[in-house]
Amino acid sequence: MSSDYTDRNNLASAIKTLGDMLEKDEAFQRLMYNASTKGEINRGRVNKVFLKALLSAGDKVGEFLNELIDHLNLFKVLGDFSWNPPVLKEAELNERTSQLRTQQHKYVERVSGFSHYGFGETGTPARGDITSPRGPQVASIEEDLATSKLAELLLAVGDHLEKIEKKGQFLPENVERFSLDCFITSESVKLSSEAVELAPCYTEPVIIQRSKEQTEKYCQEYVRSPHTSSHLLSNDKTQSIRIGQLFSPDSDGNTPKTVILCGDSGRGKSFVLEKIILDWVHLEHHFENFDAVFLLKYEELKCLSEEMSLTELLSRSCSLTSDQISQILQLTPEKVLFLIDGIDDFSFNAHIQISSPTDPSQKAPVISIIHCLMRDLLLVESSVIVTTRYTAAAELSSLCKRPQRFTEIEGFSERRVQEYFQKFFQDEQLFKKAYESMKTNETLLTFCSVPLLCWMVCFCLKKDADQVMTELKTTTSIYVHFVSTLLEDHHQSQSFLRSLGQLAEEGMKNRQNLFDEKSVTRTGLDPATRVFMNKIYLKRKKKHELLFKFKHLSFQEFFAALYYIMLDEEESWCKVSELFNMMESEALIHRSPPIFRGRLSNPIPSVMMFLCGLFNKKVSSSLFEKMKSTFSHNVKLKKKELKKKLMKMIPAMIRQYGFELFALHCLYELQDERFVTKVLETHKFIDLSNVSLRSTDCLVLCYCLRLCPNIRELNFMNCDLTAAKLKILQPALGLCETLRFSVEHLSEIGDLIQILSESKILRELKVREDEYGVESPRWSFNLSVTRGDVLLTLSSSEKNPSFSSVLNIRLTCAQSQISRTDWTLFLQRLRKTGTLTEDSSADDDHVSLQLSSLHSVGLKSLDLTLVSLNESWASGIISLIQNCTSLQQLKVSVTGLLLEEGLKLLKKSLTDPHCTVIIEGRRNCSEPSEEHLRQSYEKVEIHFKPKLLEELAELSICNPGSSALNIHCQSCVDVADSDQWVQVEPSVCRGEGGTEFRITTPAGRFQCSRTRMRWVCDGDVTLHYRAVDGHFLNAELERLQCERVAPVLDVNVISGKLEEAHLPHYMCLAESDPALTNAVKLLSVEDEGISLESVELTRFHAKILQPMFSPKTVLVKLGIPVKVHCDLLIFMTHTCPIILNVYFFPSDSLVEENIKTEEKSSHQIKCSRPEAPLQMKKQHSLEVPDAVVQPEAIKLRGNMKPNFFQVKQPVVNDITMILSRVDDQKSVWTGTIWKKLIDIKLNKTESDLFQSGQKHKTSQPAHSFDKAQFFDTHWCNLIKSVENVDTVADKLLQKQIIHEQFYSEIIHHKSTSEESMRKICVIVRKGSAAVKEIFISILLQENPNLLNHLPSSDS
């Protein structure tokens, strides 16, 4: 083998080593990437080019290559300095950096002596395979090499190292401590000799940026200052951001100068700051604008008692001198970033005089310097990131004057948990085994959203996966298992644990996190022990003081709680009681604004939570067993006493302080189902609105709600709920009647709708998209369930919608059908609808897909509000009608124009739809004339009805008259009530109990003109019904402490089936007490007794789904103020003097009938009824000028026979009446009976009583008899008695009682008088009472003696 071949083979091996190293070197790759983006190096071929250049150098490159590899290894160490701090000390770093810089210049000189292969004239590598070079180029080697990129590369490496060297001076002097503050190292727990480095394990947490409006709302409620957060960025939106976006500009280009990062314990706040400083050292582009970054730990600063300047303070945290720092602050203060970690107990009182330095060289107490930095009295041009727990965040935000951004750190998403597991276990098989087993435990997966807990779980899984999966259910259980494992490894004694707890407890009471060596020794701990604690060297003047701290503040809180239960019973209980008293006396809860409820910076609540967890015997037993102690017996004894205290304390937390979330966390840690149920048994409503809920909070809520027996309503508005969090809450949400919450996008509730559709408890679900979200429009979703039927409403907040937008959707369907469509997909399409334009080619397909989602729901009714009715929407509507046979009514309201293209398509296709279709909007006109232009903006309403309904309408001659719905209350005009009902007149007969009704209808929606009852049926149905005197219920009502607010109706379904029944009530829902809706019940009188159930109310009716009938009415609890719609009847009983009986009574057809029967010998005088509702059970007085009125006052009553005013008016004149409330003398109704009307009545009375000077001697009744009732009784006899049918038909046509076609059939057909009269009576029977009165009057006019020839009647 030739020497040349051997040298080249060795060279290739060396080059391969170099190539592998470069491929893996992150700093080198980042350098190459930066160069390639500037057009200097082709990144895709940089390594191949480098290797080709070295290959072409031949034998001469050997020595150079060896030196290069050696120093590139040094470069790797330097580049990774901040990732692996313990490797180099400062002196060694400076010496080796100097060596590299000397070698760098030698390389540049020597490279010019080497030939290279593969570079063209522009320095771009030639194409070709590296393994088969085309041969060396001999010509112009010196010139080519001088212009090659290899020299530039080495110079760039030098510059890179110089920057790293400079930035390394800003790192904390105690390099070892720098990487151990947030993560316990493997070395400290003696699992291996390697440290757990920050960079390889770091996993980015979820950070939420809050909008200005949301932050101001939270902070103003906390600080209560009109100037709160005035410097927040005005165009920040609530959204998730990454670390590199903390200083990104808002939509207006404004960049924040202060970033507040708040979050719960263990969420990774300190980690984020350390990652920022490492990214800055490694030249990450999002922090490249800063020339200096200083990290200040607030807990250490509080230990510095001497006064100093800011420059002196900063020099303690890095290797720069005060003079060097002073120069930086003076020359480029805008390029300085301060990272202030852990301001958890910040408070500022403007009335307390403290030193306020305004110059970096001015001396002051350290805490004053930090206050001035935060209050923008020092270095206003600089930037600040401050981390804090929740309660200090609001006050910090209110003090900062720089442009500010408010953020929260939530922890890991599920995807980030997986990423962290992979980094922790490194080995792919171990990772998969651990993560897949953990995923099956949803509770553990939820806890892993807290980064600190995630690390502890990984640590425990590595030691004993099976035990972890069965035992870890609470936060306390994770800490117990972690501590037990470490104690087992280190063989620590019981005294060690007690000493550790004593130190922690003393620190809790004194608000102390750092301990000197004397304090540690006093408790019996060996300062050399590093389990659970870290050492810190704090600069004090010219010496370093050794201090100790717990690995994490939460460990101090845990050990303090553990200490309490390790004491003897008397001392333990004394300290626990003291803990409770401290919580009350310091009024911690009072200082919490809504979003911070349950998230306190003070450690006492956390100690209390751990204490509750340790009193769970299953949790603490593993720790006690390893210690071989008798503590478990003490725990059992103390637990009984603790429960007594908790029974008093936890309800007080909720009732007095509104501190639900923390109380529920305590209950969760106990894991005692019977106890939790007992504590929460009285809770019917939980309101956590504006509390930012974490995944762990949702887990706690789900557990407690499932054990809350009487929970009825939840309010989770503005709680940052996501689909993942709703999934955790799902098992409990179905247990409530009323749910209110908000989400970022409605599509996140798609799965929840599917689940809740099966709930037998849910009555109302209200969801809206977060008001602080990024996107517009925002949608709201309302769902109500009544007796198996669902009313679903979707409303948009859009004020300037696009052409194809749908603004509102309102539908009804059976609850059992609601799960038959994919609501997630439907809601996603709904949001997309607003993004389409008039010319969008996707418009047709999208609208079709949107409406087709509703085909399978079993729609009963659908209301759409559209921007414009174009051909796409018309086509979609037609398809929906054709495919949804259950649809009974479809209404389309158009806010813009009804385009002719859409209308033509509808008219062509809907000649005989199976349901009623109503289109309303403004008519579009293509004519350019001025007149038509005006008409195009006129509102129109177009109806498409089934022919069957049109035929029914022709047969139903229903003039509402006095018996139909005639309520014009303006107070409740906005209360929902559908008016799309076909009004029908039933046949009437007299039974033993009074008037009864019978009717047969086809499928549709109908209203009885007599009783106002409504019903919905899918097919033919025959009903027999009547109004019942409700006095028989008075005893039961007294027992129930209720009053009736509706007639009592007894309905019998002879054939067919009713889908819905709507029973009339006379309450005014707008004017009554807001609690009325929940206090109303439907009463049913059954064979077994009475039953009560909830009922849905509309404006005038109580809605029952798929009713099973027996006598029913509507009740309301006594004591709730109720206003009702009232009717008025006035009867004149005497003419000289005039005596009037004036009745005010709830709108009840039976009551009206009974009054008229009682007053049948009197003369009714018409007067307008009260349009405003009147208060039930409230005294009212009637004032009539120049008249005597008795009694002085009456109450409006529903359960008893109506009372009335009697008015005596001696002089015939206009009679003005004023009804007023007695308590405040407020007038509620005014009416006038004109003198002329009274004269007419008086003359008519005389004419009725006397004809030709003598009284009627016939048996013919007076004209004041009830003609409608007379017809109902005698219509069979009238068929045989009336002969002049043609004349009667003439007058019926004239009065518009019959139509032209029917009139022709009577006149021209060769029928007998009896046959013609039978046809007329059939029509009249279906008419209203007014129709019957007109008919009898016509018969009497044509045949005055007719009544004498009929059998006598009781009527």
Swiss-Prot record:
Swiss-Prot/TrEMBL keywords? ATP-binding, Cytoplasm, Hydrolase, Immunity, Inflammasome, Inflammatory response, Innate immunity, Necrosis, Nucleotide-binding, Protease, Repeat, Ubl conjugation
UniProt subcellular location: Cytoplasm
Q: Which GO terms label this protein's molecular function in UniProt?
A: ATP binding; peptidase activity
Q: For ATP, which residues are the binding ones?
A: 263-270
Task: Give the main localization category.
Answer: cytoplasm
Q: What class of enzyme is it?
A: hydrolase
Q: Please give the PROSITE patterns that the UniProt record associates with this protein.
A: CARD, FIIND, NACHT
One Pfam family here:
NLRC4_HD2
Any idea what this protein is called?
Answer: NACHT, LRR and PYD domains-containing protein 1 homolog
Provide the species name. Answer: Danio rerio
Gene that this sequence comes from: nlrp1
